[in-house]
Design a protein with these regions (language model features):
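Non-DNA-binding regulatory cores of transcription-related proteins
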Residues: 75-158
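Helix-rich terminal scaffold detector
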Residues: 1-63, 158
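Context-gated lysine
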Residues: 13-15, 22, 52, 68, ...
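Structured, basic alpha/beta domains of bacterial-type, RNA-associated proteins
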Residues: 59-79
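Preference for short coil/turn "hinge" residues that link or interrupt alpha-helices
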Residues: 14, 35, 67-68, 113-115, ...
C-alpha cells in the first residue's frame, strides 16, 4: 500500500473533520431520517430522500478520510532536518527572476494544497522543480506562458 505524505497540520484537520462528521453530522442525519420516517409514506417523502442522500455523503466522506489517514505518512515540517534543502513540508521564499516579485510557498500534500494560502501540492510543477534545491539555487518551472525562473531566497521548516 502506497503512503501519501501529509503535514502534521493537514492530518489534524482531517482528524477534526472526521470527529465532526462522526459526532455531529452522522447523529443529526440519523435523527432527520427518523423524523422523516415518522411522517409515513416514504415513496414520496422528499425529506426522507434528502436525509438519505446526506447520509450517503457523510458515510462516504468518513470512509474517504479514514482511508487517507490510514495511508498517510505524517510529516512535521518543524522536525525535518534537511540541511537547507527544499523537501516536503518546507516553506520556500522565492524571487521571480523576470519580475523581481517575491512569493512564499509551503510544499504540502495533495489534500492540503491551497494556492491562495501559499500551500502548493508536492506533485505540482513548481514543487517538483524546487525539491532538492537549496538557498541561492535557481529553479526553472515550465509554466503555460513559458519557462519561469525562480531564485530560492530562503528555506524554512516550520
Amino acid at each position: 500500500m502506497a503512503t501519501l505524505p501529509i503535514t502534521l497540520r493537514g492530518a489534524e484537520k482531517h482528524k477534526e473533520e472526521l470527529h465532526r462528521l462522526k459526532t455531529i453530522e452522522r447523529p443529526a442525519v440519523i435523527n432527520a431520517i427518523a423524523e422523516a420516517r415518522a411522517q409515513g409514506d416514504l415513496s414520496e417523502n422528499a425529506e426522507y430522500d434528502a436525509a438519505k442522500d446526506r447520509q450517503g455523503f457523510i458515510e462516504g466522506r468518513i470512509q474517504e478520510i479514514e482511508s487517507k489517514l490510514t495511508m498517510a505518512q505524517v510529516i512535521d515540517p518543524s522536525s525535518v532536518n534537511a540541511g537547507g534543502k527544499v523537501v516536503f513540508g518546507a516553506t520556500v521564499e522565492l524571487e521571480d527572476e523576470a519580475t523581481g516579485d517575491a512569493v512564499t510557498y509551503q510544499i504540502v500534500g495533495e489534500d492540503e494544497a491551497d494556492l491562495k494560502l501559499g500551500l502548493i501540492n508536492v506533485s505540482s510543477p513548481i514543487a517538483r522543480a524546487l525539491i532538492g534545491k537549496e538557498e541561492g539555487d535557481v529553479a526553472e518551472v515550465q509554466a503555460p506562458g513559458g519557462v519561469r525562473r525562480y531564485e530560492i531566497v530562503a528555506v524554512a521548516y516550520r
